[in-house]
Amino acid sequence: MKLNELFAGLPKRRRPKVLGRGLGCGKGKTSGRGHKGQKARSGCAVNGFEGGQQPIFTRLPKRGFRSMSRARYEIVNIGALQRLISEKKIVDASNISKELMAELGMIPSPMSKVKILGKGALKAKVGISYDAVSKAAGKKVYLPKG
């Protein structure tokens, strides 16, 4: 007998016990839930309830907040643009608009704010519409080639 043959003859999945089908089946009447109480009711799982103990979300302090006015940018690397140009998915590299980026799935919507980052390298001359650019990408894009 080998370790990998220990469970070879056993069924892969045990059939679940059928509940609430009479007293003779062993799990009839209350179906293993006992009598009354919170856990006997349907939809019983109370999120965050720890049996009367102070829940974790009230024990821990509140931390920070999300500013409604903060600009949230979708990130596009110049390496990804170059890959799409090489694969001929971007035909006119001199005019890469937000609409085209959304169409190619780089950003979720043409209304999204776009930030260009410098990961990768550009071989083709490009014209990109964007809202922000990193220093590294700025150096690569504003070269004589880029």
Swiss-Prot record:
A Gene Ontology cellular-component term: large ribosomal subunit
One Pfam family this sequence matches: Ribosomal_L27A
One of the GO BP terms on file: translation
Family listed: Belongs to the universal ribosomal protein uL15 family.
Keywords: Ribonucleoprotein, Ribosomal protein, RNA-binding, rRNA-binding
GO molecular function per UniProt: rRNA binding; structural constituent of ribosome
Protein name listed in UniProt: Large ribosomal subunit protein uL15
Superkingdom: Bacteria
InterPro entries, per database record: Ribosomal_uL15, Ribosomal_uL15/eL18, Ribosomal_uL15/eL18_sf, Ribosomal_uL15_bac-type
